[in-house]
Amino acid sequence: MQQAIEEYFGARMGEFDTYRYYRGNDLLRSWICIPLTMGITDRAEGTLEALFSPRLWTENGLLTQEGSTTFWDRSTLYALRGAYAAGATEKATAYLQYYSRQRLVGEHVPYAIEAWPEGSQRHLSAESGLYSRVITEGLFGIRPTGLASFVFTPRLPADWENMALRNIRAFGRTFDIEVIRKQAKLRVVVKEKDKIIFSKTTPADCPLSVKFSSH
């Protein structure tokens, strides 16, 4: 599948090595972020440059297509998650913080929206879910691998000393993930009912695996 995506969609779009939306397409589209969210990083550098360039990025997030005036929170949130997945932690965090201030506490409707002017800024629960996924799947890099197991890649921003997700309800359990900076490494702890079930000091951007024991 990855090879097929590269062969069909991989393209030089202007100055960017990224993806075309369809054969013959010559305009950047915000959905070029999707391969990044799937862990496909062949064209990560060019794709990130394109997404956050003035050709797509606006003060309200990503345009659906360069030259358009319509922006979609959905593609913006996918792009932020994809940026984390590609390891662009500082860029992703800067834009996530900007987006959060602009959309959630700025002079705007206080929630993630579908689109504008298309959709008239309506609130869909899917967009709020995608915002949460920027944190769970982007910042913490959580990916289920089974009914009682997952891998995760914490992306602790350079100016943060720690971060945590608490009361995560997944895999039939409730647990916490804590990430603490320890000089050049990260100490990562997973707790279930205050019992440590996983603890490791690891280099940054290192995938970690957790498997819960049977109840």
Residue ranges and their predicted role:
Residues 63-64, 78-80, 119:
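Short, flexible active-site loops
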Residues 85-215:
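Non-catalytic C-terminal accessory modules of carbohydrate-active enzymes
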Residues 26-39, 70-85, 125-138:
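Well-ordered alpha-helical segments within folded domains of soluble proteins
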Residues 2-73, 97-114, 185-187:
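Extended glycan-interaction surfaces of carbohydrate-active proteins
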Residues 1-13, 166-172, 177:
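Repeat-unit-sized solenoid/scaffold elements
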